């Protein structure tokens, strides 16, 4: 129905599922989130409406930070109480002095951790360690948030909140509709619509 509606309006509807199509290599290199965010950035090239999210009640996967600046990482490690937790974190995060600024990078998955079920257990442990420790630091709220944000929330922020400048097309729409000009567009990040009257046979397709 969406594609039909767009065709009638001389628009091209091209849905992209950011959770499918990520290569095994990218997953093993811990680059999944960055690839998804890059896809969102690419969508901004188009002048017409380019970011639509249909969200359900699932918050989704919370990825580990791929990169943690050295000072931030050391502040976190200082607040880890158990030595085995420090050791686990230091096994998976390695200092890269070539980064500017120097940062700790999440290691790629190798050997038995190529198998997702094996990696999932370690990933959950690392996430718990980082989340519990970062809350004990004096880092800013913004710096702490990335340890708790789902991939979907990262994408929404990239697609909406980092795209606040009005495009020429949006400006033309505003000029055509004087009512919209009365809205404080600097504080309007999204329009939310609830889908009504979904056929019962399709409801199970939505998560």
Positions of PLM-derived features:
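Conserved catalytic or regulatory cores that recognize and/or transform ribose-phosphate-containing ligands
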Residues: 1-207
């Amino acid at each position: 129905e969406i594609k039909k509606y767009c065709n009638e309006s001389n628009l091209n509807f091209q849905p992209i599922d950011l959770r499918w199509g990520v290569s095994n290599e990218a997953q093993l290199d811990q680059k999944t989130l960055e690839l998804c965010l890059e896809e969102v950035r690419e969508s901004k090239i188009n002048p017409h409406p380019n970011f639509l999210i249909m969200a359900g009640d699932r918050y989704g996967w919370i990825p580990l930070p791929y990169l943690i600046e050295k000072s931030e990482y050391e502040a976190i490690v200082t607040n880890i109480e158990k030595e085995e937790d420090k050791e686990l974190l230091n096994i998976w995060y390695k200092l890269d002095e070539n980064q500017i600024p120097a940062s700790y990078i999440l290691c790629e998955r190798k050997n038995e951790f190529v198998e997702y079920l094996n990696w999932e257990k370690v990933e959950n442990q690392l996430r718990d360690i980082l989340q519990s420790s970062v809350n004990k630091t004096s880092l800013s709220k913004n710096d702490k948030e990335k340890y708790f944000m789902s991939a979907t929330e990262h994408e929404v922020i990239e697609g909406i909140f980092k795209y606040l400048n009005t495009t020429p097309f949006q400006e033309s729409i505003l000029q055509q509709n004087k009512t919209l000009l009365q809205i404080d567009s600097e504080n309007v990040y999204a329009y939310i619509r609830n889908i009504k009257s979904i056929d019962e046979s399709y409801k199970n397709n939505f998560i």
